[in-house]
């Protein structure tokens, strides 16, 4: 994902990259800067110095470098990205919907708030998730050695 492609990719929670992928913001090479969000989102996903180097040099990084910096969660063989992304999606979909939604919301919200603010923000999510039917179904299915039947309620 280069330039605008990376800016779109950075809006995603999870990224899967092929082993031969090049990832970068090359706009400075043509007299522009990455105005579609990469300068905001990239430093939130990789170390500051890596984001700065990518933005100022226009040089892309490899998929393995992106994984090492935490930008992508999985690197696959050249033609394996769709399959790996589907496996990741299926793995997420196997879990309780309310718990997944709360986890995602809290991880997204934690940036820029204090620890005290986070604990307050978490309280309504705890009330909703920990009192849900899914919170009962999870331990019951575990005890009964069966797959859970999530209701999302």
Task: Please name every model-derived segment.
Residues 147-153:
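Short C-terminal tail/terminal secondary-structure segment
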Residues 27, 109-112:
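A short acidic, helix-capping loop that chelates divalent metal ions and anchors anionic groups
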Residues 113-119:
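Short beta-strand->loop
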Residues 1-100, 131-132, 136-140, 146:
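Crotonase-fold acyl-CoA enzyme core
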Residues 54-55, 106-110, 125-130:
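Helix-loop "lid/cap" segments that line or gate small-molecule binding pockets
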Residues 112, 142-143:
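Intrinsically disordered, low-complexity regions enriched in Ser/Pro/Gly/Gln/His and often acidic
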